[in-house]
């Protein structure tokens, strides 16, 4: 009985997802987010007139800007 209980405990510990982190797209490749970063974002901004820049990656909160979208699942900001 102790062996069965010990086996169950080991399987439970191994199967737990300890320290899940979000994965977001960047302009070039993927980014593993920090544990506190709960969202992926894609945002278009204009640093110079008539030159839009696409920003993608992890973020701590969802921006409320007009040309910004955020989501909270892996690779959702493609």
Swiss-Prot record:
Superkingdom of origin organism: Eukaryota
Disulfide bonds: 24-40, 33-58, 62-70, 71-76
Keyword Secreted: yes
Residues carrying the site annotation Key residue for inhibition of muscle alpha-1-beta-1-delta-epsilon (CHRNA1-CHRNB1-CHRND-CHRNE) and important residue for inhibition of neuronal alpha-3-beta-2/CHRNA3-CHRNB2 nAChR: 48
Site (Important residue for inhibition of muscle alpha-1-beta-1-delta-epsilon (CHRNA1-CHRNB1-CHRND-CHRNE) and neuronal alpha-3-beta-2/CHRNA3-CHRNB2 nAChR): 28, 43, 51, 66
Keyword set, alphabetical order: Acetylcholine receptor inhibiting toxin, Disulfide bond, Ion channel impairing toxin, Neurotoxin, Postsynaptic neurotoxin, Secreted, Signal, Toxin
Residue(s) at site: Important residue for inhibition of muscle alpha-1-beta-1-delta-epsilon (CHRNA1-CHRNB1-CHRND-CHRNE) nAChR: 45, 47
GO molecular function, one term: ion channel regulator activity
GO cellular component: extracellular region
Site, Key residue for inhibition of muscle alpha-1-beta-1-delta-epsilon (CHRNA1-CHRNB1-CHRND-CHRNE) and important for inhibition of neuronal alpha-3-beta-2/CHRNA3-CHRNB2 nAChR: residue positions: 46
Site feature location: Key residue for inhibition of muscle alpha-1-beta-1-delta-epsilon (CHRNA1-CHRNB1-CHRND-CHRNE) nAChR: 44
Site for Important residue for interaction with muscle alpha-1-beta-1-delta-epsilon (CHRNA1-CHRNB1-CHRND-CHRNE) and neuronal alpha-3-beta-2/CHRNA3-CHRNB2 nAChR, residues: 67
Location in the cell: Secreted
Alphabetized Pfam families for the sequence: Toxin_cobra-type (PF21947)
Record field: transmembrane: none
Leader sequence segment: 1-21
Similarity section: Belongs to the three-finger toxin family. Short-chain subfamily.
Function summary: This three-finger toxin binds and inhibits the nicotinic acetylcholine receptor (nAChR).
Protein name in UniProt: Short neurotoxin OH-46
Originating species: Ophiophagus hannah (King cobra)
Lineage per the UniProt record: Eukaryota, Metazoa, Chordata, Craniata, Vertebrata
């Amino acid at each position: 009985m102790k062996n069965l209980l010990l086996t169950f405990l080991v399987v439970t510990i191994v199967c737990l997802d300890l320290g899940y982190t979000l994965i977001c797209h960047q302009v070039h490749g993927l980014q593993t987010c920090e544990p506190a970063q709960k969202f992926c974002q894609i945002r278009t901004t204009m640093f110079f007139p008539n030159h839009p820049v696409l920003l993608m990656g992890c973020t701590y909160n969802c921006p409320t800007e007009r040309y910004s979208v955020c989501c909270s699942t892996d690779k959702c900001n493609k």
